[in-house]
Amino acid sequence: MGSGGPLLLLRGLLLVGAAYCAAPRPPRHSSRPNVLLVACDSFDGRLTFYPGNQTVDLPFINFMKRHGSVFLNAYTNSPICCPSRAAMWSGLFTHLTESWNNFKGLDPDYVTWMDLMQKHGYYTQKYGKLDYTSGHHSVSNRVEAWTRDVEFLLRQEGRPKVNLTGDRRHVRVMKTDWQVTDKAVTWIKKEAVNLTQPFALYLGLNLPHPYPSPYAGENFGSSTFLTSPYWLEKVKYEAIKIPTWTALSEMHPVDYYSSYTKNCTGEFTKQEVRRIRAFYYAMCAETDAMLGEIISALQDTDLLKKTIIMFTSDHGELAMEHRQFYKMSMYEGSSHVPLLVMGPGIRKQQQVSAVVSLVDIYPTMLDLARIPVLQNLSGYSLLPLLLEKAEDEVPRRGPRPSWVLSEFHGCNVNASTYMLRTDQWKYITYSDGVSVPPQLFDLSADPDELTNVAIKFPETVQSLDKILRSIVNYPKVSSTVQNYNKKQFISWKQSLGQNYSNVIANLRWHQDWLKEPKKYEDAIDRWLSQREQRK
């Protein structure tokens, strides 16, 4: 960050705001725009509009809202890092990419939207976190996902905690993210400014994802919300909402499993919950400042008025809503993502209420680059919802559906999960659609998702389930995932040979496992002896 810090950056952007608004909108058939996508990790989309935006100062997101459009109902297609990013980079739903968990993503040679833009004349550049190809993440993460059908219940995460570092002068807390942000800024100022062709720039950030905790001891995994006093002062404590929790005995069975494996079934004081949420919001403020660095670099090089900017996240963060932290859930805190777009031709100060999802980014990028949109994509271009003038609309395939789909097949959840979101309803079903009860929430009357009304509205459940089955044969997909998990675990177990017992006893669940290791090994053996699920 420059010597003046975020405040000076913001003042500079406020001064250029009028000039940006007055900049002429390039005609539809003029040179193609530059495109920038900033994708962070674990950012709750509800913080980008009222009332969530009252909780923390996010000046650069607000700048994008004033000079562009914000989507009020944007969702991840899978609330976990790799599967979500696989959907975003491929334009395909998770059951089509078969990115079932954080270890299984796209093939390295898969043609992404950025590959096509490069093929059609764009100069492309990527910095930071990508995380959409196979073979990443820890052994613990893989094994926990593969064994979620085993009949045992083990804590897989550390109890969420906070950590305050530095003083009021400590701005750059997440050093890795600031380093890649600096690289992107340098590239803009030294390389992009001299290009004779349009560019597509991607910046991937780790924040506001919780930080890793010590592997051994009472806390392990990635459960630390870390920030400095500088960012914590951006949070309005009086506006922090303490979530209402359902009693453990009344929780949906999948929610209870998630809460237990995330180590959240113990006692938490209101002060603990408030601090966890405050530290998370402070991490969001630091993320916003990195976005500001990029916007300022574009302004300094006179590229801002020539560039379409998108800001989003792979998923959200529950931050102790529904007695959980992390993601891996279809509740709003986890599945609702930010999506803001600004640039030449984009409507300003617009709030878009249509339901959209991350698979829509692929066709949108192709539209921006004047590349014919592939017909097999799961997503639809966002441009018809964004462009200032009707004549600017690009040819597209059929009407946008009135729903979005999200699905989850990874760790911390013991059943494949499918979510269909419409304008009013959120329908969540599991596994084969029979063995686990569904959930239905009326988000217009119950935005906190505290009352499952599936029994009260059986016709709505039936109607939404019919739509869902027309999109995906989810019982078959669930069976496919179960068989995949078992085969992967068997292969991993065989690769360890005599070391299997020692290795599995030292994964993230080691504290619970070591209490009764024989019991848990026997449970795995029973699971392995069961017949393969029919597809």
Curated annotation (Swiss-Prot):
Compartments, as annotated in UniProt: Secreted; Lysosome
The EC number(s) this enzyme carries: 3.1.6.1, 3.1.6.18
GO molecular function, one term: arylsulfatase activity
Catalysed reactions, semicolon-separated: an aryl sulfate + H2O = a phenol + sulfate + H(+); Hydrolysis of the 2-sulfate groups of the 2-O-sulfo-D-glucuronate residues of chondroitin sulfate, heparin and heparitin sulfate
Cofactor(s) listed: Ca(2+)
Protein's UniProt keywords contain Oxidoreductase: no
3-oxoalanine (Cys) PTM sites in chain numbering: C81
Catalytic residues as annotated in Swiss-Prot or TrEMBL: C81 (nucleophile)
PANTHER family from the UniProt entry: ARYLSULFATASE K
Listed name of the protein: Arylsulfatase K
Protein species of origin: Gallus gallus
